[in-house]
Amino acid sequence: MNGRGPVGPPRSGPVRSPATRRAGGDPLIRLFHVSKSYGPGSVALRDLSVEVRKGELVFLSGPSGAGKTTLMKLLFAAERPTEGQILVLGRNVARLGERRIPALRRRIGVVFQDFKLIQTRSIEENVALALQVLGRPPREVRSKAFAMLRRVGLQHRRHELPAALSGGEQQRVALARALVNEPAILLADEPTGNLDAELTIEIMDLVAAAAARGTTVLVATHDQALIRRYARRTLRLAGGRLLEDIPGGSI
């Protein structure tokens, strides 16, 4: 199995917003009629078709249970679809062999609401770990970890443990860890859910900067004020269905 499958859906293709149609190059993310069920009466996603191109920052909006987190899990192969096809960086996730999943995940950064930092390791070690598991040389690991911590404004606290940092600072560390390997895609699941308004903007500015450098970014959020502030393309989900694909600037 080579991790790739047929890309032509039997029905109409993914939804493209006007901004997506204007963008150059092939989409990095493509979903064709994707559904995800966890059993009878437990359908998380229903017939979702959409695509996202390089450098787009896209919000996933909707209430709890809308399917936002399930979609994120499908994109980095933590879950497999019940129906449909998912192409991420040219790989068919629905058919990707277990041995090929780590290679895909190396190109995807993930940020969670609860940070998921290793509490017994320093800030620098948390960020460096993302490079160490790839077998990067120690000198490169130290250099890139320091540079990324400087980008998020925490290089002066690199030797401290996560518990010594505020919630906003820990989220910046989580973001640095997700971006240190220069991923093609960044998935952020409610990255500002536990932060106040000032810290929310701080984190989102860093996320937007990553998109400006060419990273494709998906942000799941309940925060409508945040969506209005950044005025980017928004996929509005409810009951596992895509209700609207709203172009940036239209919200």
Please name every model-derived segment:
Residues 161-165, 169-171:
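Conserved ABC ATPase signature
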Residues 84-92, 104, 144:
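Conserved ABC transporter NBD signature motif
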Residues 121-129:
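Short coil-to-helix segment of the ABC ATPase nucleotide-binding domain corresponding to the Q-loop/switch region
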Residues 93-109, 138, 212:
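ABC ATPase NBD coupling module
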Residues 76:
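Helix-to-loop junction immediately C-terminal to a conserved catalytic motif
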Residues 182:
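Conserved catalytic motifs of ABC-family nucleotide-binding domains
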Residues 186-189:
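Catalytic Walker B motif of ABC-type/P-loop ATPase nucleotide-binding domains
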